[in-house]
Amino acid sequence: MRPSLSRDASDTGRRHSLLQQSKLLSIRLSNAGKRPSLSRGHAHEKDSITSSHHRLSTGPVNNNPRRSLMVKKPNTAHGTRVPILNDHNDKFENMTLQDFEIGKILGKGKFGKVYCVKHRETGLICALKAMEKKEIVQYTIQKQFRREVEIQGSFKHKNLTQLYGFFYDEKRVYLLMEYVYYGELYKFLKNNGPLNETLASYFVYQMANALDYMHSKNILHRDIKPENILIGFNNTIKLTDFGWSVYNEDGQKRKTLCGTIDYLSPELIKSREYNNKVDVWALGVLTYELLVGSPPFEEDTKEMTYRRILRCDLKFPLNVSPQARDLIVRLLQFEPSKRIPLSEVKSHAWIANNRGSWTDL
């Protein structure tokens, strides 16, 4: 199992017609302050948001956290109020949990759970992320939550999960999101093993598209891994979980250590300033994992993994084609400036030579 760095959080209660779901939540937020450092730890188990779950979907449960880094203990000095939500009177003003039939759990995170839900009035199937207000405050991640909502709410791209809005009640904040039918890529790989090169190339192309779009908006994802990629119909994939995402305007360099150990780039491990090239590195790790079934630098301990990452110690099985190896090597360059641009990833020979077979998938 792979460790990941923690974050997440939520709270809220409101409403408007879901018939206007195509209009994303508009939020007036400031970009003040650094990203808070978070500890991994285990959140206290909370009561289910409903005692009776209707089976609305067959989505997967994510109980496979990867190795993560301890970066901060919770702050227990604050109350349970979440100030960032007080000045928002948006479309979902009167929505409550009672407007939904609650289905099975799709995933579990540090600060909450994701459920499959059906809106009673419209029949719309959505994913509902329920997060504990108390823990948002305890772990001092109000700004992070605000940024996550603002960033995801700004996206309009077929390979990024859509945020419809949020609402809250006394105990929790709820993010209402697009439901992606087949669930996590991680679980698919775990159950089925590595992908063939045709399907892998299609997934990598879509990921490059999504990241290119995010980077064009000066946003870094910073936590790319199969757990944060969902599979929809027709092999369409969607990047999700923007809890570590951050603005990176004017070529600004970041310093916060975050992400999943197997996917960390050399500059993150060495605590250097970094930019959107950390996402490019992570795409290289993902490409390898799609084809091989495990990350390229995975070892028994964090220290051993770090050593292999810093040496760019790549070992390819014989079944990985020369063209796929070439792309992976060009993505996993030690120096960020030498990593292949995303625009060139989309036109790389490995992608181009497999493109003609994508319609047969």
From Swiss-Prot:
Q: A GO CC term? A: nucleus
In residue numbers, the region (Disordered) covers 1-68
Membrane-crossing residues?
A: none
| Record-listed ATP binding positions | L106, G107, K108, G109, K110, F111, G112, K113, V114, K129
Q: Listed disulfide bonds for this chain?
A: none
Q: Mind telling me which Pfam families this protein's record contains?
A: Pkinase
EC number(s): the record gives 2.7.11.1
Annotated Protein kinase domain ranges read 100-351
Q: Name one GO biological process term.
A: chromosome segregation
List GO molecular-function terms, semicolon-separated: ATP binding; protein serine kinase activity; protein serine/threonine kinase activity
Which reactions is this enzyme annotated as catalysing? L-seryl-[protein] + ATP = O-phospho-L-seryl-[protein] + ADP + H(+); L-threonyl-[protein] + ATP = O-phospho-L-threonyl-[protein] + ADP + H(+)
Per the record, the similarity remark reads: Belongs to the protein kinase superfamily. Ser/Thr protein kinase family. Aurora subfamily.
The protein here is known as: Aurora kinase
Source species of the chain: Kluyveromyces lactis (strain ATCC 8585 / CBS 2359 / DSM 70799 / NBRC 1267 / NRRL Y-1140 / WM37)
Gene designation: IPL1
